[in-house]
């Protein structure tokens, strides 16, 4: 499984892990999120976002509008 893509046979039909059997860590470059083809529970719309890392910040890019946001992070000890 070192040189293959893993993807479901049909859209929005399978989960990766369960509440009882979770993956320990996910190692990825950018994180691409989309619920296109369905709606969210808050306002009934759909979105498409990418989370990217900077040197000192995390950024959220709205792929539908092109708007970019910076996460407001507060250091904790």
What residue ranges belong to the model's regions?
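Short, surface-exposed terminal/edge motifs of secreted or surface/virion proteins that either
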Residues: 57-74
């Amino acid at each position: 499984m070192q040189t293959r893509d893993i993807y479901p046979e049909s859209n929005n039909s399978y989960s990766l892990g369960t509440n009882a059997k979770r993956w320990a860590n996910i190692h990825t470059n950018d994180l691409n999120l989309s619920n296109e083809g369905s709606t969210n529970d808050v306002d009934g719309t759909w979105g498409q976002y990418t989370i990217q890392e900077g040197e000192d910040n995390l950024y959220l890019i709205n792929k539908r509008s092109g708007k970019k946001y910076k996460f407001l992070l507060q250091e904790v000890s």
